Regions:
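NAD(P)-binding Rossmann-fold cofactor-contacting core
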Residues: 27-48
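N-terminal Rossmann NAD(P)H-binding glycine-rich loop of SDR-like oxidoreductase domains
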Residues: 10-14, 18-22
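Short acidic low-complexity segments
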Residues: 32-33, 50-64
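N-terminal Rossmann-like NAD(P) cofactor-binding module of classical short-chain dehydrogenase/reductase
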Residues: 69-70
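Residues in the short beta-alpha loop(s) of Rossmann-like NAD(P)-binding domains
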Residues: 14, 37-40, 98
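Extreme N-terminal starter segment of soluble prokaryotic enzymes
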Residues: 3-8
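Conserved Rossmann-like nucleotide-cofactor binding loop
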Residues: 16, 42, 75
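Rossmann-fold NAD(P)-binding glycine/threonine-rich loop
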Residues: 76, 81-88, 95-106
Length: 106
């Protein structure tokens, strides 16, 4: 059986969970961080997470089929990321808390 490396896009890469997740990815043999982003104006934009520079372009997280967006951001950001995931056909894992009933229904 051939092993596939799962490509990960990480919004909120500079946050507490983002840093923890990027560390776990760095120590994994079957995951690779391929995109990282922070909100516009964040002092983390341009800094490196491993070999990846943190971007402020959310669209860069839509890495396509075979990739996964791992989201632990804020509800408003999650909804934007969900649209990006749908359009780019990127799977998404949502760990964001505080979603409204309407947001969860969407």
């Amino acid at each position: 059986m051939s092993e596939q490396i799962v490509k990960i896009a990480l919004p909120g890469a500079g946050g507490r969970m983002g840093q923890m997740i990027s560390s776990l990815i760095a120590h994994s043999d079957d995951m690779q961080l391929v995109a990282a982003a922070e909100r516009k104006g964040s002092p983390m934009v341009g800094m490196a997470v491993g070999d990846i520079a943190i971007s402020d372009d959310e669209a860069s997280l839509g890495i396509g089929p075979g990739g996964v967006i791992v989201d632990f951001t804020r509800p408003e950001a999650t909804m934007t990321l969900l649209d990006i995931a749908v359009v780019s056909k990127t799977a998404m894992v949502i760990g964001t808390t505080g979603l409204s009933n309407e947001q969860e229904a969407e």
